[in-house]
């Protein structure tokens, strides 16, 4: 009788241990999945920003080429109008580059958020939002208030374009650094998912965590694929908006 009665608390302890493990496992699994999702969105935002900055650099390149060939414009007002068109396109890219309706490479006075923040359970990542339209606006002001028949004025505008292009390159590089940090963290998080899966498998082999069967190696591999595919879909959607 004593043996039978003593087995009850032992079984209860075993059951409690199993339930505790399952709860902890599920909590950790969900936490890692949310982390991957946040990091994935951050990486996609980075790629969107860089794609748009590349387009903006093309427009600045067009402006620079037109300034270098200013003599081909008999009426310098025609040159200004042509430059203005590129600058308008530059700004259009800036204001159409959004993620979840939020501007990424443009800000204004009324913006609540002046930075892009990616938060996970273990780390927070942040990059200041660039206000790229200021580059185009400054070139616009200088160009339209200058006599482009004057070679000195022409060089001043050209110099301003070069400076803006360099600043834009720095912004691109900042996003590269930001993206690299996110990608490293994402890989570490997915590695943690693999480790969690392996740990869970060992415990299941010992008859623990029998109820926790929905997280398999397939899920981990799927996360790797999701990371790339989801980013591609987000970036592609942005590209379609910019081209339309």
Specify the residue positions occupied by each region the protein language model found.
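Proline-poor, low-complexity alpha-helical tail modules
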Residues: 1-9, 191-244
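Polar, low-complexity export/assembly segments characteristic of proteins
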Residues: 4, 91-181
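Structural signature of extracellular appendage/secretion-system components
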Residues: 4-106, 182, 200-203
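The cytosolic transmitter module of two-component sensor histidine kinases
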Residues: 18, 154-157, 217
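General secondary-structure propensity
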Residues: 25-29, 180-189, 208-213
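Amphipathic, well-ordered alpha-helical segments in soluble domains
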Residues: 59-62, 66, 164, 192-195
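Intrinsically disordered, low-complexity segments enriched in Gly and acidic/Ser/Thr residues
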Residues: 163, 170, 174-198, 202-203
């Amino acid at each position: 009788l004593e043996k039978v009665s003593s087995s009850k608390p032992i079984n209860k302890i075993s059951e409690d241990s199993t339930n505790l493990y399952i709860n902890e496992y599920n909590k950790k699994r969900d936490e890692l999945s949310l982390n991957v999702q946040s990091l994935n969105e951050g990486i996609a935002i980075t790629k969107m920003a860089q794609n748009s900055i590349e387009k903006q650099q093309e427009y600045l390149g067009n402006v620079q080429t037109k300034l270098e060939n200013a003599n081909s414009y008999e009426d310098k007002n025609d040159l200004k109008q042509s430059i203005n068109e590129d600058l308008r396109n530059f700004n259009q890219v800036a204001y159409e580059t959004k993620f979840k309706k939020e501007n990424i490479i443009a800000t204004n006075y009324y913006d609540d958020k002046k930075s892009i923040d990616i938060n996970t359970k273990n780390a927070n990542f942040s990059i200041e939002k660039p206000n790229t339209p200021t580059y185009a606006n400054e070139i616009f002001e200088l160009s339209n208030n200058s006599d482009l028949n004057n070679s000195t004025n022409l060089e001043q505008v050209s110099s301003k374009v070069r400076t803006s292009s360099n600043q834009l390159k720095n912004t691109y590089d900042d996003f590269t650094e930001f993206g690299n940090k996110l990608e490293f963290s994402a890989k570490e998080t997915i590695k943690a998912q693999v480790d969690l899966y392996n740990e869970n498998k060992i415990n299941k082999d010992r008859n623990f965590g029998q109820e926790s069967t929905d997280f398999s190696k397939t899920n981990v591999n799927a996360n790797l694929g999701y990371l790339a595919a989801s980013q591609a879909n987000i970036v592609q959607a942005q590209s379609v908006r910019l081209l339309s």
